[in-house]
Amino acid sequence: VGRTLITSTRYFPKIENCGTSLAQIVTSEPVGPWKDIMQGLVISISSAKKYFYIQTPYFLPTEAVLVAMQTAALSGVDVRLMLPMRADNRLTHLGSCSYLADVLYSGVKVYFYKKGFLHSKLMVSDDELSTVGSTNVDFRSFEHNFEVNAFIYDTETALQMREIFLQDQRDCVQVFLKNWVKRPWYRKAAEIVAVSYTHLTLPTTER
């Protein structure tokens, strides 16, 4: 094992074109000067004119992403957020729930997927842009983990992604603000404790 840079075509054969869609591969890492995927997401949300749909297993957004979602919804954009009803990590799920009132107040539509665990990381906007990859909508993915996403600028792909979202939405229950604010005080307290704890302990290996 050495530090020789391997560039031989034996290991990296030439890639042939296999389609016409324009895709931008974006990476993020904790040691870089920019949070590229988060910045791409913020720009995408802020640029949406009609709709922006998000599927993510964990929702612990940075302030920039949260404000972008709220601003878009307040501007009349149909912003939808889909989360699993039951997550694989209860603490993280409680932390995610602590942010829901913030987005519901601004008009974001929130859905809990009830047909198993939702692990999709999909975002689609205006039948023009979609992005998929390893990134969760959480601060660890944006700021601390090594992640990669494809931003795809193609109508056909966006329509397919939109249809996937809408099909999954049929297996969801919608969360309404008037009901959400009535959850018990001890549940709200648990969410506050959970979100504080996850900011300190959410494992960087969580995917």
Q: Where are the predicted features?
A:
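Charged, low-complexity intrinsically disordered terminal segments
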Residues: 1-200
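Single conserved hydrophobic/aromatic residue that forms the stacking wall/gate
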Residues: 199-207
